[in-house]
Amino acid sequence: MSFDYRALATAALVAISSLALAAMASGPEIKTAVTGKTIHGNMDSTGPYAEYYTADGVVHGKDYKAKWSVEGDKMCWTYEGSPKDCWDVEISGDQVRWVKDGKSQGSGTIVEGNPNNF
């Protein structure tokens, strides 16, 4: 009896890919998760962050403001001097993962309200 390890590996990759895709949040889920909340986390390219997301689409950070929106099933940010940048989002409870071009680029923890008083 012979076992086809390639078939098993292929099946495992398909299953993992399906799980990853299923975990991406929808537009309404993103809005519900972030509106009126603060997210503390770390981005691979820029390091630690804390941002408060208002219902009217403003992002408040320690020393800056920006705009946020949801377009389709992506969250978009427009920081001063930069073009709009949209990302996929994975949400699990109070945890968020920012995904760009299929790769995780950062993560954070969602906290109720504006504890930093931004």
Label every PLM stretch briefly.
Residues 2-3, 13, 18-118:
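Lipid interaction determinants
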Residues 8-9:
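Gram-negative bacterial Sec-dependent N-terminal signal peptides
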